[in-house]
């Protein structure tokens, strides 16, 4: 049902659909310790999370936590976030990449995003000058969730891939619908056939429709 909603929103506006897709972020955050999850959602379910994962930045382990700094790109929705996550790579040998979660006021948003057609995703850079993040506020991205319900048993990285893919599915379907409407329009003043009466257009539209259906 969530995927269907994201697809419908994306058909109306691609940027809105892209940002709406990140409503699945609780699937990521479920890998935080249980006590941290209570702090995140203990007072309200209306917590907006945005993440800048790449490139992961080196993190020094200190006092049961990490000292972090750096710049992370493509943090969609960060302007309206209450919590921000950034990708870190602990310094110790063999450590897995993690995500560190910080309050929005500890993160600077550098407005670098000005992409034609998708500017409203607000996928700006995140900058952290120097911050301490307790280990309890970090997690391995895609790690085992600490919430045992059907939703959280589904692999979070697989879910993330699906919600992002369905955004483009909504855009593609809307584009097809627009072309179909144009193809059946009025004939030109010269009496030439409209687009939909041309065999090459029918074939191209049919192939495109087949690709969208196969992707769905």
Ranges and model annotations:
Residues 116-117, 121-213:
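Glycine-rich beta->alpha junctions and the first turn(s) of the following alpha-helix
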Residues 5, 68-70, 128, 172, ...:
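Buried hydrophobic positions in well-ordered alpha/beta secondary-structure cores of metabolic enzymes
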Residues 62-64, 90-97, 105-107, 133-137, ...:
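Secondary-structure boundary elements
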Residues 47-50, 115-119:
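Short Gly/Pro-enriched turn/cap motifs at secondary-structure boundaries
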Residues 71-107, 122:
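DPxDG-like acidic metal-binding loop motif
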Residues 56-58, 73-76, 89-90, 113-118:
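A generic local secondary-structure boundary/capping motif
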Residues 71, 78-81, 110-114, 137-141:
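A short secondary-structure junction signal
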